[in-house]
Amino acid sequence: MKLSELLKNVKTDSVYTDCEVSDITDKSNEITKACVFVCIKGNHFDGHSVAKQAEEMGAAAVIAEHDIGVENQIIVESTRDAYSRICAAFYGNPAQKLKLIGVTGTNGKTTTTFLIKNIFDKLSIKSGLIGTVKNITGDKEYTSSLTTPDSKELQRLYAEMVDSGCKYCIMEVSSQALAQGRVDGCHFDIALFTNLTQDHLDYHGTFENYARAKRKLFEICDTAVINADDEYAHVMVDSLPCKVYTFGVKTDNTDFSAKNVKCFSDSVQYELLTPDNIGRINIKIPGRFTVYNSMGAAVCAVLAGADFDSVISAVSQSKGVPGRVEVVDTDTDYTVLIDYAHSPDGLENVISSLRETTDGRIITVFGCGGDRDRTKRPKMGKIVGDLADIAVVTSDNPRSENPELIVKDVLEGMKSCKAQIKTLVNRTEAIKYAMSIAKAGDVVLLAGKGHETYQILNTGKIHYDEREVVADILKGKI
């Protein structure tokens, strides 16, 4: 491909030498002969510092935000934006051949995108999926490493979806991806807002920056679908240039609403109302938050043109998502659940929902991630301490931090809580303890890791699957 073709949608005043391009990259360890190297300044590394090295290694051109003294340099205002656009051009602008449905918010993104995918599958609408658990491009599936892939991988996945005949791409769009411009140049047919609570402040710095990043998605879409019950809904919808639809449970002043909500230990039931229709949903995923996730998914499908009654039927047939209120097969008189809840709001939602349907005690095993926002640790501790009967504080993904110090931060918020508190830094020991004290009717909630099958320690990433841990405990292997 010619360099000039890659730069068609990139604004630059630079005079450059047109040439054949073999590849594009923003990673210094992927520089090859005849590639285009894009200099991106991150939190820990500035690609501009290796621009000369890229030229010496045979890069055909270097894209930068300022003069870097190489022969074939292209200066742009934002290399992140430019990288996203040239990646799209490199793969033939595949997003233009797909209808994009993006879901953003602190909690509920994964479940909502899976539910939309399930609905489309039931209705024989071929679609791809991009998100936290896995990426699906028609007949192929890949394990995910990021909620929203980097620009190059994202465009590659789009292209694979197009090649496999997908009509839609349903994707989680993280705040980091929006802030870093990974979806710059993409236009979404439908964008859904689930909710906004404290998370990722280690990256964004302030809650205002976090909210601002989320809002970006609704500035590049045709139709916005907003959870009106969330207190920050107004931040998302204020002065939007697109058409806005709202949904909710707490008010009648929405386009779509849920009435007669009933929560059971293994399901939720409710009536979905629109100005023209009413449908009864009975979905086998427990928790009050399931009402919001499934309603948001149904609204997106209806706005995409699907028949209302068919959508209602498809939602009711949908199954749960790995690591989201996932019931572990234990054959015991108590229940073991695995859930990805790793924020204050996420923990509050899942424990509060369990309280509605649990006759026995709620025993919660949880920790907080290392090298992440420290301010949410005592908040998470307080929430679990106030809502659970027994709180077992342990490790999550400590990363480079001392796990004992992370636990200490969590305990700061649990000084006056009602729950019994046990601290066991080793997560396996914590799970074993929780299961050993569980009685008939109790729920053991393993919170934080969800679908993850690894744990990140200061020595690196190790295999760690809580389903396997639970099975081994029951077999007496641990």
Question: Model regions: which residues?
Answer:
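Acidic, Mg2+-coordinating active-site environments of NTP-dependent enzymes
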Residues: E5, A64-V70, S164, F188-V336, ...
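Short, well-ordered alpha-helix to beta-strand connector turns
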Residues: V21, K33-A34, A59, V70-E71, ...
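Short internal beta-strands
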Residues: A60-H66, A224-A228, V365-F366, D389-N397
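Short, ordered loop/turn segments at secondary-structure junctions
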Residues: H66-I68, T132-V133, S175, L196, ...
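N-terminal leader/targeting and accessory segments in enzymes
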Residues: M1-R85, A89, T223, S257-K262, ...
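ATP-dependent carboxylate-amine ligase
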Residues: M1-T12, K33-V36, D46, P241-K243, ...
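Phosphate-binding loop of NTP-binding sites
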Residues: L7-V10, Y83-A224, A228, Y232-K243, ...
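A short acidic, helix-capping loop that chelates divalent metal ions and anchors anionic groups
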Residues: V70-E71, I136-Y142, Q198-Y203, R372, ...
